[in-house]
């Protein structure tokens, strides 16, 4: 004991406690706010106070100790995926130069200043090809396979390869017929969750994809893309026989039947056959007399929606079909085509008796009376 002072042991203990408290405060100031691992590490830094007499080096080796819970969620997941479910072996600590039972907090590619809390925090694993960053090294490794083209996961049934193992699992449902995602409204089941989400919009009426030109909304992104072609005039699908192009692939399939003479849809009433099911439905209204499309202005009803659209233009005065030669406009497309023959000289209606051709069908009908045909 020093004269007139505290006992030497008590003074040394007090000084040590003050030093540890300062270390704790400094460490917490450097750690992210609310960090659980920082609080645990700081708490552990006070533990050597009870072992003040322990030789240097038997406690924590240089700097704040690693917290037991500091292994991140991604690393824990990686550990579970390794054989035996154990973390990687000891690695060299970048902070101390020695070995640690856990990986360093600073990733190998973090760059200068990473230990001081640089911009790597949160997503410390960047892709060298595109710069995108990831929270987990395993996610970064999976992403890099997109650039390398590597597809290590292969379907055992058909041999198709995939980038991610989860993609193989989804693909194999096509072979097994498994459909684990069922709609709670109607019970329809799907092999993939995103197909169920798309289907549910049928029940909810949700239409998140709106056309930027006219505002019309759609429940499916693909339907919105198809609709956009009506504004752009883009026709991606061409007929291999004649080169005629169409907005939709289904239109090409129907068109090809005109080349092959295929008419798979037959009327049960009269036996007339059609290349398209929609044409058969329209034809059947001739027998039933059904006219489901009524004009809201005058009440007149029509068997086809296209007839109603053309009729509505009588009330609105709309004439959307304009001649490029003389500028004359027409309500109906049929009138526009008839007018075009004035400029082109086309005469598609030919008499089978004498070979004379006409521009309009009713002119041919009138001419045939010359030959005595009704």
Curated annotation (Swiss-Prot):
PROSITE patterns registered for this protein in UniProt: ZINC_FINGER_C2H2_1 (PS00028), ZINC_FINGER_C2H2_2 (PS50157)
Gene Ontology molecular function, alphabetical: DNA-binding transcription factor activity, RNA polymerase II-specific; RNA polymerase II transcription regulatory region sequence-specific DNA binding; zinc ion binding
Keyword Zinc in annotation: yes
GO biological-process terms attached to the record: regulation of transcription by RNA polymerase II
Any matching Pfam family: zf-C2H2
ZnF (C2H2-type) ranges: 125-147, 153-175, 181-203, 209-231, 237-259, 265-287, 293-315, 321-343, 349-371
Region called Disordered, residue ranges: 30-119
Swiss-Prot/TrEMBL keywords: DNA-binding, Metal-binding, Nucleus, Repeat, Transcription, Transcription regulation, Zinc, Zinc-finger
Sequence ranges of Polar residues compositional bias: 32-46
The keyword Metal-binding belongs to this UniProt entry's keyword annotation: yes
Localization annotation: Nucleus
Source organism, top-level taxon: Eukaryota
Signal peptide positions on this chain: none
Family named by the database record: Belongs to the krueppel C2H2-type zinc-finger protein family.
Job of this protein: May be involved in transcriptional regulation.
Protein name stated in the entry: Zinc finger protein 696
Species name: Homo sapiens (Human)
Source species taxonomy: Eukaryota, Metazoa, Chordata, Craniata, Vertebrata
């Amino acid at each position: 004991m020093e004269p007139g002072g505290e006992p030497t042991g008590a003074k040394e203990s007090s000084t040590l406690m003050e030093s540890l408290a300062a270390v704790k405060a400094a460490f917490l100031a450097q750690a992210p706010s609310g960090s659980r691992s920082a609080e645990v590490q700081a708490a552990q830094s006070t533990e050597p106070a009870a072992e003040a007499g322990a030789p240097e080096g038997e406690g924590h080796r240089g700097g704040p100790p690693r917290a037991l819970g500091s292994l991140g969620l991604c690393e824990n997941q990686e550990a579970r995926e390794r054989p035996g479910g154990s973390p990687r072996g000891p690695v060299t600590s970048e902070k101390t130069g020695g070995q640690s039972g856990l990986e360093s907090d600073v990733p190998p590619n973090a760059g200068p200043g990473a230990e001081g809390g640089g911009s790597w925090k949160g997503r410390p694993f960047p892709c060298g090809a595109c710069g995108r960053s990831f929270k987990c090294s395993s996610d970064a490794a999976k992403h890099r396979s997109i650039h390398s083209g590597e597809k290590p996961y292969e379907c055992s049934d058909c041999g198709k390869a995939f980038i991610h193992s989860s993609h193989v699992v989804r693909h194999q449902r096509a072979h097994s017929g498994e459909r684990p995602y069922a709609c709670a409204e109607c019970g329809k089941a799907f092999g993939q969750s995103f197909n169920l989400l798309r289907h549910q919009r049928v029940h909810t009426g949700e239409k998140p994809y709106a056309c930027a030109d006219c505002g019309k909304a759609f429940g499916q992104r693909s339907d919105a893309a198809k609709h956009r072609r009506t504004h752009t005039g883009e026709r991606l699908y061409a007929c291999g026989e004649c080169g005629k192009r169409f907005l939709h692939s289904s239109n090409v399939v129907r068109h090809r039947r005109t080349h092959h003479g295929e008419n798979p849809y037959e009327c049960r009433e009269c036996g007339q056959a059609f290349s398209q099911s929609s044409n058969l439905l329209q034809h059947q209204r001739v027998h039933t007399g059904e006219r489901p499309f009524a004009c809201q202005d005058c009440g007149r009803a029509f068997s086809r929606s296209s007839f109603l659209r053309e009729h509505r233009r009588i009330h609105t005065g709309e004439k959307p079909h304009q001649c490029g030669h003389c500028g004359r406009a027409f309500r109906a497309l049929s009138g526009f085509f008839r007018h075009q023959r004035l400029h082109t000289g086309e005469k598609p209606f030919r008499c089978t008796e004498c070979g004379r051709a006409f521009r309009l069908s009713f002119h041919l009908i009138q001419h045939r009376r010359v030959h005595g045909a009704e």
